[in-house]
Amino acid sequence: MAKKTNYVKNGKEYYRVTVTIGRDENGKLIRKEFYGKTKKEAEAKKEEYLNGIRNGLNVDFQDVTLGDLMHTWLFEVVRMSRKPATFVKYEGHYRNYIKNSELYGMKISIIKSIQIQRYYNKLYQQGKSSKTIKALNNFLKTFFNYAVDEGYLAKNPCTGKKIVIPGTPEEKIETEIETFSDEEIKKIKEALKGHRLKALFLLAFGTGLRQGELLGLKWTDIDFEKKELRVQRMIKQVTIIDEKGNRKYKTIEQIPKTKNSIRTVPIPSSLIPMLKEHRNRQREEKLKAGSVYLNDVEKGYVFTTELGNTIDASNLLKTYKKILNRAGVPYRKFHAIRHTYATKLFERGVPLKTVSELLGHSNISITANIYTHVIPKQKTNAVETLNDLFI
């Protein structure tokens, strides 16, 4: 039974209510104290706490801060269970927007939607975009789901219609996707003549593969007879972050982004001879390098360094920029090649569903949201219409 006594703290008199909530691992009783200016106030705090326990909340839910729980979640749960890129993204949100914010030291049990909303409004007034705040909200929503599951919160303050992402409708409109014109593609082709990675860039234009998917492609994934390739892995440069925030970079092989990303993509027939020529070049590089060459030119990666190492994203980007500069074509992100592939298919009458499958999007609505002009046609024949770009 709870014990009630008058209590003096800092010269002021309070009512104190003590309740026993169980025993620790050593058998010692666990007690919790509640204070109020009146007995009724102290009792109300006790009942609020006990109701939380009855509803499945953790016994120490009132003592844990958002910052402490988020750090534990990030470094002991997310880092061990999610892809490295996801952890890096989440750690960035934590470091840039939570660690030094007013939310960090707040007891997680008292955080309400209005406090989150005020913080978002403040960020917007400081110049942060709606897109940035929306990404932060998605991050917090995921974290608070964990907090609910672990018994530190009864409900997620970021779900439902409680939170409004600040910003004008005009700001929320996506910017137009970047693509290359037919004339620019011709200039890039010209700049690629004699380049050892010519096949990589033209295959990107001809298949729409993501950068990591191109780098993860192996010779065993290519069927020269059927003129198609199989996407089933990707090479990615990831950031490894320890609990102190120290960073190092590593190139890894991993499975594609989603289930639909694992797919078969037809290769325009005009690119087949170029791929065979690239393979012969790779064989020559192996002979020249001798025992230090690391790749298997029959079963290994299609695109490597001259010594057979995997190509990391940063080095590929440098090469890409040099090629655009040599071609006299304004810089666009590497992903613009993928957008160009999709746009050219749409221009040639390929249906939305087919383009979505070729791109490996997780659902057709993603494709529809990115590309707006769509007309029907057939898959393999559709890709063959790209041949004129390479002749």
Swiss-Prot record:
Entry's localization field: Cytoplasm
Keyword Flavoprotein: no
A single GO cellular-component term on record: cytoplasm
More info: In contrast to other XerC proteins, it has a much longer N-terminal part.
Single GO MF annotation: DNA binding
Keyword terms: Cell cycle, Cell division, Chromosome partition, Cytoplasm, DNA integration, DNA recombination, DNA-binding
Residue intervals of the Tyr recombinase domain: 175-384
Entry's transmembrane regions: none
Family: Belongs to the 'phage' integrase family.
Active site: 210, 244, 335, 338, 361, 371 (o-(3'-phospho-dna)-tyrosine intermediate)
Domain of life: Bacteria
Pfam family, one: Phage_int_SAM_3
Cross-referenced InterPro entries: CB, DNA_brk_join_enz, Integrase-like_cat_sf, Integrase_catalytic, Integrase_recombinase_N, Integrase_SAM-like_N, Tyrosine_recombinase_XerCD
Protein name: Tyrosine recombinase XerC-like
SUPFAM superfamilies on file: DNA breaking-rejoining enzymes
